[in-house]
Amino acid sequence: MAATALFRSIRRRDVVSAPLSVYKSLAGNAQPSWGSSYIGQNYASFSRAFGSKPVVNDILGTGLGTNNAIREEREKSKSTEAAIVGAQLTRSFRALDVGTSKRLFSTISGDIKTTQEEPKIKSFRPLSPHLSVYQPQMNSMLSIFNRISGVYLTGVTFAGYLLYLKMGMICLTYPSFYQVLYHTQQQLPVITSVTALAAIYHTIKSTHSLLTH
């Protein structure tokens, strides 16, 4: 087999080199010119195509090699891209897990702190919206008593007007009216003293308010 392959290769070289030797001998005997040199170059390129090394096999081999290299590069790039994406996903998942765990622990600790805190002492609301301290003061108490005394004096005056000036003239024939009047007269010293005290206090407080304000 080796001998037959060697014989075939020698025959191919003889066939290819025969026209080239003939061409060289003819070109040496002939006169050189621009056209003959151009034709000789074309013939040389044509004969080189049928040389000992098969051009088709070289082209096919080169093409297959480049295609394989391109495929390998694409596969490598895809594998690197997949590795990068996987690394980014793992980092994001780790960050998400850490963030959720931190939030969970923070909420638990916040609940524990709120449960362990002592209740704050609630202060009393002010009796007047103009006060800055939430506790009863003398000014507010005096103002409240002044208003109460004014209302009391108004009620006593209106009740006396109705009982002694109007209802007596109308209800002279009703015995129940005289009973109410009799019981009212028994409480009259207490009512009179309270009314006098309220009148004095209201007068003094009103005068003081007018002078100061």
Curated annotation (Swiss-Prot):
GO biological process per UniProt: tricarboxylic acid cycle
Primary location: mitochondrion
Residues binding heme, per UniProt: 130
Transmembrane segments: 148-165
Subcellular location: Mitochondrion inner membrane
SS bonds (residue pairs): none
Protein's name in the database: Succinate dehydrogenase subunit 3-1, mitochondrial
The gene coding this protein: SDH3-1
